[in-house]
Design a protein with these regions (language model features):
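Glycine-rich beta-alpha loop elements in corrinoid/cobalamin-binding modules
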Residues: 1-70
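Well-ordered, non-membrane alpha-helical segments in soluble/globular domains
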Residues: 1-3, 114-118, 148-161, 184-192, ...
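Surface-exposed amphipathic alpha-helices with a cationic face
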Residues: 2-10, 103, 162, 241-245
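Flexible glycine/acidic-rich beta-alpha junction loops that bind and position SAM and/or redox cofactors
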Residues: 20-26, 133-146, 179, 209-224, ...
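Catalytic cores of alpha/beta
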Residues: 24-33, 186-188, 260-276
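N-terminal pre-triad scaffold of radical SAM enzymes
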Residues: 70-105, 111-114, 118-126, 130-133, ...
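Radical SAM enzyme core and accessory elements
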Residues: 95, 315-386
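Conserved SAM/AdoMet-binding glycine-rich loop
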Residues: 122-251, 257-259
């Protein structure tokens, strides 16, 4: 291939990014893909030296970890030189909530000034981009003191973005901040007034539910509900979902299955919370626990560890997401006539997903979960061919 030929001529490959930690679990891929160095963490203070060493033909380290004390200051983070993917614009780095499964909370909180954000918006605008994704672990604490929202900073930020972009989205917000900022400041109302216009009438965002269990929340993410007590975490989640539903904010929510010390009562609590969220427009995506952050010494959760309650959570998430996915697609997404072919393809895809989901449910019911986990070959049932 061209890359292998270039490697023979001295090409060096340095990789990084948010998922760089995954290379540590598949070191065999380093040789397969010819990777010379993996940078795990914020790279601004190390990448120039690595590039210089590569250009000079010097030996490169296999792995570079950038710890919390070595992250760049805002002044050391350069403005982007070319258009970003999907119009992504960073507004801050770090997170103060301290969830034990998340590596971002290990890094200090730093806010980009509006002047720096505007320069990146201008780079994207010059490239013809008309949309923007504001990137942060929690957009609603931009400019905050601790976890206390700063309405003035947020309103100025969104007003600035709408000056350059027709549409915007949020990469992440926390559910506690959605509820608190609306209850205390009516901030979601005010932001909607700034954002919604002839070009945009909804916002997409990723949020983290992670678990419906108060017991687990207390152990692994005690500040996730702050400023509310963690004991009312399910109520915080439901109220935030209600606020987002009323304001046409569409969350893609994550759940984590297989958290350390997870028991049947925790999964039952998650199922009960999912029942409470049925009426709120959202996508809910379950994930298996991956050892990161303060829990990086724990074991991965694997398919072989699934039990009946895990399967019930997976099923409930799947049908919730399919049902609301159809609603979102028909009422909010790709409404322009020119997107009709794409919309039709998505409808066909959802129909396929529903058919395969029903087939999978039948297989588990007929064969039993244990046989499916062992990887027993699954032959289509007569009903699945209809």
């Amino acid at each position: 291939s061209e890359i292998r030929e270039a490697k023979r001529r001295g090409l060096k490959i340095i990789v990084g990014g948010p998922a760089a930690w995954q290379w540590l679990w598949r070191t065999d891929y380093w040789r397969e893909f010819g990777v010379d160095t993996v940078v795990d963490g914020e790279a601004e203070n190390v990448i120039v030296e690595l590039a210089e060493r590569a250009l000079n033909g010097e030996e490169l380290p296999l792995y570079v970890y950038v710890g919390p004390s070595d992250v760049p200051s805002i002044e050391e983070i350069p403005v982007i030189k070319g258009a970003s993917v999907n119009g992504l614009v960073e507004i801050m780095r770090g997170c103060p909530r301290g969830c034990r499964f998340c590596p971002v909370t290990l890094r200090p909180l730093r806010f980009y000034p509006l002047e720096k954000i505007e320069k990146e918006l201008q780079v994207n605008a010059r490239a013809g981009l008309k949309g923007c994704i504001l990137h942060s672990e929690d957009v609603l604490i931009y400019g905050a003191k601790g976890l206390e929202p700063n309405p003035d900073a947020l309103l100025k930020l969104h007003t600035l973005v709408k000056k350059y972009c027709r549409t915007l989205a949020w990469s992440h917000v926390t559910l506690a901040e959605v509820r608190y900022s609306q209850e205390r400041y009516r901030l979601i109302d005010k932001l909607a007034e700034v954002v919604y216009d002839e070009y945009q009438d909804w916002i997409g965002v990723e949020v983290g539910i992670e678990t419906g269990s108060v017991r687990l929340a207390r152990k692994i993410m005690p500040a996730k509900a702050a400023p509310y007590p963690v004991e009312i975490w399910p109520e915080v989640v439901e109220e935030a979902f209600a606020i987002m539903h009323d304001h046409r904010i569409v969350p893609a929510a994550t759940l984590i299955l297989g958290l350390p010390d997870e028991g049947e009562e925790d999964l039952t609590a998650t199922l009960e919370l999912l029942d409470r969220l049925e009426g709120y427009r959202s996508l809910i995506v379950p994930m298996f626990f991956v050892p990161l952050g303060a829990l990086k010494d724990r074991r991965w959760f694997l398919r072989e560890q699934l039990n009946e309650l895990h399967v019930e959570v997976l099923k409930k998430c799947m049908w919730h997401t399919v049902r609301w996915g159809e609603d979102i697609m028909s009422k909010l997404y790709l409404r322009d006539l020119r997107y009709a072919p794409v919309k039709m393809l998505l409808k066909l895809f959802l129909a396929y997903v529903k058919r395969k989901a029903r087939e999978a449910e039948r297989v588990v019911e007929e064969m039993g979960l244990e046989r499916v986990k062992r990887g027993v070959a699954i032959a289509p049932t007569p009903a699945s061919d209809q």
